[in-house]
Amino acid sequence: MEIFGNVVSGLGEGRFFVGLTPYKNKFEELTGFIPFEGTLNVKLKHNFNLDNFNPIEFDGFEINGKRYFGGKVLLIKLFNKHGNFVNCAIVAPKKTDHSKKTLEIIAPIQLRKFLSLNNSNVVKIVI
């Protein structure tokens, strides 16, 4: 399946959460890559239901009495307008401030830099 969306700025929280060792280790286990510390946010025209694609669920954890929630991961390919792509994953935390129209994507590299992406650029996601 192919879906299209626009690159948008995030809240800056992806860098913090992806950088936490338990998340980083879990993402490596589930995706096969060590994620770059940050996410690429992609806004869709319609709500996206990750559960329609059999995502992999992961549990939360606790650090120094603070609870961090689990979520779901779905492996994808992300393409820029030139057809260049990166194997990555959609991450859907159980607790998020994003709408169901915004996807958070992790990858082993900085996607904006590697795929020359700026806000409003259209990307293709292949599931």
From Swiss-Prot:
Protein's GO biological process: FMN biosynthetic process; riboflavin biosynthetic process
Pathway per the UniProt entry: Cofactor biosynthesis; FMN biosynthesis; FMN from riboflavin (CTP route): step 1/1
Superkingdom: Archaea
GO molecular function terms attached to this record: magnesium ion binding; nucleotide binding; riboflavin kinase activity
Binding sites annotated in the UniProt record for FMN: 96, 104
Residues at which Mg(2+) binds: 39, 41
Residues that coordinate or bind CDP: 10-15, 109-112
Reaction equations catalysed: riboflavin + CTP = CDP + FMN + H(+)
InterPro entries xref list: Archaeal_Riboflavin_Kinase, RibK_CTP-dep, Riboflavin_kinase_archaeal, Riboflavin_kinase_CTP-dep, Riboflavin_kinase_dom_sf
EC number: 2.7.1.161
Function in brief: Catalyzes the CTP-dependent phosphorylation of riboflavin (vitamin B2) to form flavin mononucleotide (FMN).
Family stated for the protein in its record: Belongs to the archaeal riboflavin kinase family.
Protein name: Riboflavin kinase
Organism of this sequence: Methanococcus maripaludis (strain C5 / ATCC BAA-1333)
Gene name as annotated: ribK
